[in-house]
Structures are given as C-alpha cells and as structure tokens.
Amino acid sequence: MSAQTSKSARRALVTGGSGDLGGAICLALGAAGFEVIVHANGNLAKAQGVAQQIIDAGGQAQAVAFDVVDAEASAAGIAALLEAGPVHAVVNNAGIHDDAPMAGMSAQQWHRVIDVSLHGFFNVTQPLLLPMARARWGRVVSVSSVAAVIGNRGQTNYAAAKSALHGATKSLAREMGSRGITANVVAPGVIEGAMIGQAFPPEAIKQLVPAARAGKPEEVAALVAFLCSDAAGYINGQVIGVNGGMG
C-alpha cells in the first residue's frame, strides 16, 4: 500500500509502527514529508491502517511485516526495501515487556526481551548504514525507556536491553558522523497507550511523575520527527528523555 512517490521524498522505516507510540511516530514523520514505511512484526493489517492514515492526510506510506528477531527475515525485508533506494531514516521502536523480578525471571523472559530490542536493532539498522553513507545523509533514532536510565523493579531484562542501545548508539554516532548520519536515543517515561491504565493507575502516575500525568505519544513523536530532520544534524550520540521529569 503506497501513495505516489515523489523522487525527492526521503524514506523512513519505523519498526513497531503499528502500535500507539509507533503509529504516532509514523504520522509525525509523514507530516514532516517522509515516505513512511510502517513496520509490524506480524499484524500487517494494523500497519496498513496506519499507512492509510498517512495517505489520507496527503502523505506517502507503505506497510511491511517481518520479525526483527529473525536475522534472515529481517535481511530479506530490508533488501526488498532497498531495491527502491536508500532508507534515509530508521526509528527502532520495536520492543516488548515481559516483566518479573530477576530472582523469578526465566531465561526465556530474559532472552526474548533482549532479542527484540537489542538484536532487532542490529538486524534492522546494520544493512541500512552503507546505503545511508552513500547518500551522505541518515538518521538512526532508537526508542529506549526511562527504565534504562534510572532502573525499574521487575524490568532488569527490559532495562538491560534498552540501556545497551545507549552504548551502541553513542558508538554508532562516532562511526558514522562524518558521513552525515546521526544516531540518537529517545527515552520515554510513562506514555499513554492501550495498556497504561492497568500498569499505572492515575494516582500512581501522580506520585511517580513530577509532571503528574502520563505523556502523550505525540509528544514523543514530535521529538523523533525533529531528530530525523535536517535541523537536528548536529545532535548526535545523545540520549534524550521525554518523561515529565522522572530522571
């Protein structure tokens, strides 16, 4: 599914683009003029719905589905996208929770969360880098979490996976900065979404977040879209929180 593609349009891939936050990021990038590739791990129909919203607003979009943990599936999916030219921006938003205190956490819980957030980051980003370098322009934005900055009970796996992205991103910024490529991390706090009510009741949010409210997906998406813009070309290797003052 796609709209007519302008020859000058930059292309942006958003992994996990069919969820609440991912969808908001896709819409923001579409409004910023990118041709948006909305990725889903499995729910292609939902990704197509996000793509259609972008098209209905006058933008350009398509939907794709592959498992970011599967190296071969990711390589095939990325190769197919690169047949149409470089992907100029990638937003690594795919991630999962599988919470438990570490003393009671299974090896499967540990590995699965790290596989999606960390190995998925490599599987998707690595094959995009040389085409970006040849284009002399690129943006890599990875979505982390405040848990990676200050920690959170029951999330040693999630915090480990996301904080690993911080180090990888800072190193990548040094490797690719001379090629016009920036790499940054956005670390949201408590953000509104389908599951927020169960995990964080309103009174808990007021106690936990200095801003006394949950953030909106659009507030995170606005920062991601800015980091993908020309105006953010000198911001590189940074971890930027969007968390209402949590840390």
Language-model region placement:
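Residue(s) in the substrate-gating loop at a strand-loop-helix junction
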Residues: 145
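Substrate-binding pocket helix/loop in short-chain dehydrogenase/reductase
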Residues: 101-102, 109-114, 205
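Short, small/polar-rich loop/turn modules that mediate ligand/substrate recognition or access, typified
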Residues: 177, 182, 235-237
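C-terminal substrate-recognition "lid" of short-chain dehydrogenase/reductases
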Residues: 129, 137, 216-242
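Conserved glycine-rich cofactor-binding loop
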Residues: 18-19
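Conserved glycine-rich Rossmann-like NAD(P)H-binding loop of the short-chain dehydrogenase/reductase
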Residues: 34-48
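Active-site helix of classical SDR
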Residues: 125, 161, 169
